[in-house]
Structure formats: C-alpha cells, structure tokens
C-alpha cells in the first residue's frame, strides 16, 4: 500500500520528470538493503533481535505517518519522499535479518519448513492485496489515508512483538564485525547452492 501511494505521490510532485524520480525513489529505497543487510545480519547475532525488529517497525511506522502529515499539511516536497524512502530502506535492512533469525527461536525445528512457507505466503499475499487496497483507498480517501492506514498497520506488529517473551542469547564469537562479515561471505562462497541462490535472488530483485 505504501509503495503504490508513494509512486502516485512522486508522479504528482515530479510532473514531467516523474520517470526519473520514480526510478530514484526506488533506488534510494533499495540501496540501503543492498549495502547494509549483511551488517544487519551480524547485528542480529549480537543484539536482541526482538528489540532490533521493534526499532525497525517503529522507524517504518514513523516514516508512514511522516508522509501522511506532510501531505495533509500540504508541505510535501519530492526530497521529503526520497529521504523517507532511504530511511525506510535502512530500517528494512536491519529489520529483515532480525525477523528471519527470530523465527527459529519461536517454533520447534521440525515446524520450521512450514513456518518459512507460511511466511512466504503471507509476504506474497500482501504484495497482491496491497496494491488493490492502495488503489481503493486512494480513490475513496486520498493519499493521506493510504499512508495513515499503513502507519496504523505497524501497530499490530508492534503489539505482537511486545507480547513476545524471547530470551536473547548472544552468539559468542569474540570477533570484530568486519571479521564476521568476511567469515559469512567466505562460507557462502564455498557453498555452491548458496552462491546460486544468492545470484538468483540478486538478479530477480535487481530486475524487478
């Protein structure tokens, strides 16, 4: 919902330059994910994953409400949208690894494949339903409602995370963060299956 409303907002603000700014907006939103997700994985190993994910949700909720407020008070500018896209991308870069690594702590190992499948289903279902809801909300209530509803949706996730009681057990390494990053990349490089999956994932993400 957020992305579709944001694209419409960029079209409205940029006018004849909308193609460039649409591309720039997507680039700035995805660049932090490309650059910082590896670091986010190391941070998720070292720190409380639930708190890290909570922080990510708070930031994304704030950017949604921020856009709603800027549009409502008619002070929105294209640079606001670009900046908030980058901030959202940064939050996702650290929240994504925390989310993925939190899941095995919540369920039995035998149920993990089903949990991963269910997580994938809900993610893709949201990608299908989100644009439909965004279009309906835009037509009926306008952009403020789209951003506001998206911001409110984070409250449910935050409430669920606050209700979780997961004991944080740091991964003992004694290594510097840079060394852990190198170790992770070295492991992936020597696992052919992981290399293939990484290339496929990068290509599909990059090409849309």
Kindly label every feature range from the protein language model.
Residues 1-208:
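Alpha-helical transmembrane-bundle signature of multi-pass membrane transport and export proteins
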């Amino acid at each position: 919902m957020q992305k579709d409303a944001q694209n419409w907002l960029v079209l409205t603000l940029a006018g004849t330059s909308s193609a460039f700014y649409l591309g720039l907006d997507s680039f700035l939103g995805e660049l932090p994910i490309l650059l910082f997700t590896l670091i986010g994985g190391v941070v998720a190993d070292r720190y409380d994953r639930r708190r890290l994910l909570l922080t990510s949700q708070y930031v994304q909720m704030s950017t949604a409400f921020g856009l709603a407020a800027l549009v409502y008070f008619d002070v929105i500018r294209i640079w606001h949208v670009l900046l908030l896209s980058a901030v959202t991308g940064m939050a996702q870069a650290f929240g994504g690894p925390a989310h993925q690594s939190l899941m095995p702590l919540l369920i039995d190992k035998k149920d993990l494949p089903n949990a991963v499948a269910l997580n994938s289903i809900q993610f893709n279902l949201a990608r299908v339903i989100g644009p439909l809801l965004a279009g309906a909300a835009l037509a009926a209530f306008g952009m403020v409602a789209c951003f506001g509803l998206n911001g409110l949706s984070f409250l449910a996730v935050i409430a669920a995370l606050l209700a979780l009681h997961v004991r944080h057990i740091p991964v003992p390494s004694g290594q510097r963060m840079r060394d852990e990053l190198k170790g992770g990349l070295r492991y992936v490089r020597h696992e052919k299956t992981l290399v293939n999956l990484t290339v496929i994932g990068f290509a599909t993400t990059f090409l849309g």
